[in-house]
Amino acid sequence: MPPLFHFVPSPMAGTVLYPLNELKQHEPEIWRREVAKYDGREQLLEMPIPPLGCLWNDVLHLSIVHPREIVAELEAAGVEPLRRRFLEFDAGVFDPERTVIFLNRPTDVAARSDDSQWLPFESANLDRLVELTEPTRRYNRECAMRRERPRLFAYLPHVFYRAALETRALPQLEV
């Protein structure tokens, strides 16, 4: 299975990554900073994730696409990427009952939770989703032309995990 990635929050309190709803209870100040990323997109926080029986803010969001590829694509589009550290997770340790793949295809927000957006968390599905998508490339170029900073994971597939994760012994990479 390919690895999964999550950027290291800055600052990160402790060594546990929490979904937003749990973070609010454990670290309210950090929660305020993290939830602010959804300004203007608040409806996402209540988006259902039917395969897991929960909401968008009840899960951790992990990238299937390697951060170096994302950074290289941003640079190719003419965007100076923010430099970040990422945690690297072994996808083989995730409980498939608590994990799902979200394809994140372009659509209106109301349709984002339709059945075609979800895949079971299986190695074969992960293996075919490690590349950047054409909608991501197009979005990055359009943002560059408008001189706007693109969202880092726009239109890229995500892995959603319904639990907190200990990060203490994980490898980190800087991109």
Segment roles from a protein language model:
Residues 1-175:
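Active-site-proximal loop/hinge segments that shape catalytic or ion-binding/gating pockets
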